[in-house]
């Protein structure tokens, strides 16, 4: 069985999840970002089909405590020296804006591409799954379920619980993902060739945290 490598883009905890500003203070928000990213990465590491995890972030400690099993890459930096990963665009910004799918303009898409290129360079032959780091309910068995559904598809994606966003993006070897993250990304990913996977609505793979209402999710850490 071909192994999967996971790419997890994580924002600087100090600036992530801006839409939760009214529900959580800055420290609580930063703590929540770290806690959710750590929970997501732990689920991936415990999944049977995942060989390794690459975290892409502008923060030196996006997981709070570094894990020796995780490769940490810096977020791509724009030519003016500013980090390209803003908070615009829901799950992380970076709408394509009409550029070629393999050359994202900036933001989350650029971070995803950096992680994918690292995997392609260091683990040739591996499949790639991009997982947003805000899935606190995600279980290892749910990760394996998604990857088994995606194993025979060149490119696929997992829609969020609302059916409009994207929580996971997959590409089997030798294909590369075409990231189109931002509001309404599920439709854009489908248009770019990532077929939607029929993952159960109750799966933690679909329950991301973006809005205050999402904090009521059973597995969501309270506060931080």
Predicted regions and their residues:
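Short phosphate-binding loop-to-helix
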Residues: 66-87, 95-127, 185-188
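A short, N-terminal amphipathic alpha-helix
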Residues: 33-50
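Short, glycine-/small-residue-rich phosphate/pyrophosphate-handling segment
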Residues: 167-194
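N-terminal nucleotide-binding beta1-loop-alpha1 segment
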Residues: 1-20
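Conserved alpha/beta core of the MobA/IspD/sugar-nucleotide pyrophosphorylase nucleotidyltransferase superfamily
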Residues: 184-224
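The conserved acidic donor/metal-binding loop of glycosyltransferases
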Residues: 132-136
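Acidic donor-binding segment of Leloir-type glycosyltransferases
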Residues: 50-72
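Conserved donor-nucleotide/metal-binding helix-loop-beta segment in metal-dependent transferases, i.e.
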Residues: 138-163
């Amino acid at each position: 069985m071909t192994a999967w490598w996971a790419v997890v883009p994580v924002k600087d905890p100090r600036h992530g999840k801006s839409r939760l500003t009214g529900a959580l203070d800055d420290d609580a928000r930063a703590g929540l970002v770290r806690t959710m990213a750590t929970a997501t990465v732990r689920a991936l590491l415990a999944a049977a089909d995942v060989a390794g995890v690459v975290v892409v972030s502008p923060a030196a400690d996006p997981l709070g405590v570094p894990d020796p099993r995780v490769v940490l890459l810096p977020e791509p930096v724009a030519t003016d020296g500013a980090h390209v990963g803003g908070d615009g665009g829901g799950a992380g910004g970076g709408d394509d804006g009409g550029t070629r799918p393999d050359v994202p303009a900036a933001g989350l898409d650029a971070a995803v591409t950096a992680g994918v290129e690292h995997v392609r360079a260091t683990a040739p032959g591996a499949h790639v799954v991009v997982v947003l780091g805000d899935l606190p309910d995600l279980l290892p068995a749910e990760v394996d379920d998604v990857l088994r559904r995606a194993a025979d598809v060149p490119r696929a994606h997992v829609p969020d619980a609302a059916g409009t966003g994207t929580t996971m993006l997959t590409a089997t070897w030798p294909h590369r993902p075409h990231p189109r993250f931002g509001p309404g990304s599920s439709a854009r990913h489908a248009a770019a060739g990532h077929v939607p996977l029929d993952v159960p609505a109750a799966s933690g793979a679909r329950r991301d945290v973006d809005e205050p209402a999402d904090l009521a999710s059973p597995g969501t850490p309270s506060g931080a």
